[in-house]
């Protein structure tokens, strides 16, 4: 698995919103527009409703435009810590009572923090939507950050970091790669935070984060499922409408400086096998120019390299030459910060990382000089569709793709229109982006140098109580 899956997963979810409709764009897009409604409350909160009446269920999500990229040095991880604290009680609820109320009606809830946002969701039978809105609106304005609860929860977060990062070689490499690839962009910091920052964090840091960013005018409410737009609007006005807007902190531009040479790092960590990852700075989709073709060409290139079992990387390096046990590619197509295009590989036994690098470069040169045939382009687009088509079967996935686009400054209204740009990608576009972006001056190479793996006692991997978010 590619160590850049965090970025890739976010990009894939967003890209899926566009690619899903490829096979039936003409007839499906207008219907989706009719089934999706948007309005804004007087306090600035945007509400988006997607009707899907196939089952009497609803996904209710609140997304805040506040993620790890908004943190300052010395307080990394506070966005994720606050996410944990959102389940630790309000003026009206005891710690843990929020989730108990959701479970009591047969629903499920959770939350997640990204570099660009923090999101909270519930999936419930449709008659319980009013109760979910009441609960979520309560903690938007009445969160109680107790000093004692914080002291316990910060220990949970630190243990989460130990288990999911410090004890996982691929996670360590990913963390170090991001820190090396980005110089001044906050994407260089891990979402979970640096351990020293967590050790020195106080409940006042979490409280300040809550006060700075958690407001209706910094949030988007997405409701998908068996609902009527008018009913959702009335409920949103009832529960979220009375919450006062806040003055949101100014977000200063944090544009990554131009890289001026290859960066290479070697990470020593307990592991069975070595691995090498190449990560190039790459453009993202800009809300101000959704028709710029390069991000779409890079997405198609990623699929050509690693979109199916017979893709170029797998066919040439794993099947034919047997140089690698695994190899994959990914590209972060969207986000508020700079993005990366990556290729990762684990060499087969007896094969060197140098040979892997040499052959990956040969594959890229071949694409740059010879291009891609029309049949391969068509096949990749078809495979992209087949891989994504089932996402719309889930009301949860529908809510996700809408919300992620909105968090990145792209209206859901343009998701299907953007598909036309995928169709426009030609072989010369792919050749151009390889030549323009996959260059050494924009490259960071991370090598995993495996160290002896220490055996752990039984139960050592057990997650601490409360590790859920």
Task: Mark where each language-model region is.
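M16 family metallopeptidases and their MPP-like homologs
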Residues: 50, 55-81, 95-140, 169-196, ...
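Short acidic-hydrophobic surface loop/beta-edge motif
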Residues: 37-42, 265-269
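Non-catalytic, conformational "gating/processing" segments within enzyme and secreted inhibitor domains
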Residues: 154, 204-239, 442-443
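N-terminal secretory signal peptides that target proteins for export/translocation
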Residues: 1-8
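Bacterial N-terminal signal peptides
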Residues: 10-23
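Boundary at the C-terminal end of the N-terminal hydrophobic targeting segment
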Residues: 24-28
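His/Glu-based metal-binding/catalytic segments typifying zinc-dependent metallopeptidases
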Residues: 162, 179, 248-310
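Active-site His/Glu-centered metal-binding helix of metallohydrolases
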Residues: 78-86, 301
């Amino acid at each position: 698995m590619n160590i850049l899956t965090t970025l890739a997963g976010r990009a894939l979810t967003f890209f899926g919103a566009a690619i899903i409709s490829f096979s039936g764009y003409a007839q499906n897009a207008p219907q989706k527009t009719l089934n999706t409604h948007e309005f804004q409350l007087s306090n600035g909160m945007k509400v988006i409703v997607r009707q899907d009446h196939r089952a009497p269920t609803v996904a209710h999500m609140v997304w805040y435009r506040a993620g790890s990229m908004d943190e300052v040095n010395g307080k990394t991880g506070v966005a994720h810590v606050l996410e944990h604290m959102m389940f630790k009680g309000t003026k009206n609820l005891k710690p843990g009572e929020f989730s108990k109320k959701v479970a009591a009606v047969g629903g499920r809830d959770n939350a997640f923090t990204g570099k660009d946002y923090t999101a909270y969701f519930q999936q419930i039978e449709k008659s319980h939507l009013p109760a979910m809105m009441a609960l979520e609106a309560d903690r938007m304005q009445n969160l109680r950050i107790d000093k004692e609860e914080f002291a316990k929860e910060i220990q949970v977060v630190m243990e989460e970091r130990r288990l999911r990062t410090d004890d996982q070689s691929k996670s360590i490499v990913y963390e170090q790669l991001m820190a090396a690839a980005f110089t001044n962009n906050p994407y260089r910091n891990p979402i979970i935070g640096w351990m020293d920052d967590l050790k020195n964090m106080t409940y006042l840091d979490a409280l300040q984060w809550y006060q700075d960013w958690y407001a209706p005018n910094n949030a988007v409410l997405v409701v998908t499922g068996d609902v009527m737009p008018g009913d959702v609007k009335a409920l949103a006005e009832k529960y979220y409408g009375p919450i006062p807007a806040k003055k949101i902190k100014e977000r200063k531009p944090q544009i990554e400086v131009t890289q001026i040479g290859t960066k290479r790092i070697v990470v020593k960590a307990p592991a069975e096998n070595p691995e090498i990852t190449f990560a190039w700075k790459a453009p993202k989709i800009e809300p101000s120019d959704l028709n710029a073709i390069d991000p779409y060409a890079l997405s198609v290139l990623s699929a050509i390299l690693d979109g199916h079992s017979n893709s170029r990387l797998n066919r040439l390096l794993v099947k034919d030459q047997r140089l690698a046990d695994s190899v994959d590619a990914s590209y972060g197509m969207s986000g508020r910060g700079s993005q990366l295009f990556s290729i990762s590989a684990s060499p087969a036994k007896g094969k060197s990382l140098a040979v892997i690098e040499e052959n990956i470069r040969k594959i890229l040169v071949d694409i740059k000089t010879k291009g891609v045939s029309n049949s391969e382009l068509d096949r990749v687009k078809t495979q992209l569709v087949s891989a994504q088509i089932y996402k719309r079967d889930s009301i949860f996935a529908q809510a996700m793709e809408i919300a992620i686009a909105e968090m990145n400054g792209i209206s859901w209204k343009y998701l299907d229109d953007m598909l036309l740009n995928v169709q426009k990608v030609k072989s010369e576009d792919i050749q151009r982006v390889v030549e323009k972006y996959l260059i050494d001056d924009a490259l960071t190479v991370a090598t995993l140098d495996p160290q002896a793996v220490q055996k752990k006692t039984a139960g050592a991997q057990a997650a601490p109580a409360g590790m859920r978010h």
